[in-house]
């Protein structure tokens, strides 16, 4: 399934989806949602909404750093997971980075998150692990 991916400033949709998708990980790891941090980071991100038939089904948030695009959020609504939307979003992020002359994608993911399989399949490699979070990177050729 191929989503339409468009720029968005729909902070409410993004926050709701992120909080919902991350709640179990936060609870399991004893983490808490930091609204102030989300507010601050939201203003710094290039954010995109994934749509299927005009229905919002996911969010992708990117931040350009010195030599890499950092995928700060890639969230897909549960009913739409495992249907290729995450893969489509990663391809979009790669094209976006390449267009900007950037040749690395980076992300951080909970080590217990099943999305690890997707990231590894897409060529991301673990750089380091701290506090149950993997820092991963993929070089874009």
Say what each PLM segment does.
Residues 1-11, 139-141:
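Conserved N-terminal entry element of GNAT/NAT acetyltransferase domains
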Residues 9, 15-41, 45:
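Conserved GNAT-fold acetyl-CoA-binding loop/helix
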């Amino acid at each position: 399934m191929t989503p339409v991916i468009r720029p968005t400033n729909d902070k409410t949709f993004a926050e709701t989806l992120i909080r919902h998708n991350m709640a179990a990980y936060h609870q399991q790891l004893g983490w808490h949602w930091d609204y102030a941090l989300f507010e601050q980071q939201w203003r710094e991100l290039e954010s995109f909404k994934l749509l299927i038939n005009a229905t919002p089904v996911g969010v992708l948030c990117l931040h350009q750093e010195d030599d890499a695009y950092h995928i700060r959020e890639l969230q897909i609504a549960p009913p739409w997971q495992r249907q290729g939307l995450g893969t489509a979003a990663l391809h979009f992020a790669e094209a976006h980075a390449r267009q900007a002359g950037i040749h690395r994608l980076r992300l951080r993911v909970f080590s217990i998150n099943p999305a690890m399989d997707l990231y590894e399949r897409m060529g991301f490699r673990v750089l380091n692990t701290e506090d149950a979070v993997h820092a991963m990177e993929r070089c874009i050729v």
